């Protein structure tokens, strides 16, 4: 199966909600999460998918096909991997309120060092079998966003994200949206032609079926199933071919899971 995770940027809005704060390279050269405890102390460990999978594969190497781990679909507006690498943090222009607060709370913030640290983590991850895809720079709904806006958005991704994570030919659409119908992409699809011209060849949406794949001479298109708390709570039967939800559901999790 193809394993992916969206939005591994540790956005500002996630602060204080029990999420890790960033990915780091520890003293052993391994990629781990930094986690800020309630008392402000910092712990380092397996607190999100990337280090959890890395640790699991060490114990079960047959789980990984030719050393591959997964694909991370990345935006850029809040930076990447927990590092505040977008140009707005350097220029101080067009900042959102949470970005302003971050800079106010970190008067010693060093943009150049932040980018350097993010590159170090990305390099270590790629060496361990992780790959990166575009998730659009601004988490855009590609179906609802105009072509001109998507062009501006992709330009930002290539300018501010690609130098850190590397170039990619994969785009995993935010919101599970898509740029065409199930029938396939055609030459008169302007959004597809644009992304094709920018070097993208692998396109992923979200689909509830067990598998949805289209392969042509020009592109590979695949649906993804969201393995999250929402799907586990409301539609466990859709995941039954993968695992028994009752065996992995954490009983301490508050229910009902909020609707969408």
Predicted segments with their positions:
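Metal-dependent polysaccharide deacetylase catalytic core of the NodB/CE4 family, i.e.
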Residues: 1, 9-180
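C-terminal active-site subregion of NodB/CE4 polysaccharide deacetylases
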Residues: 1-3, 10-15, 127, 142-260
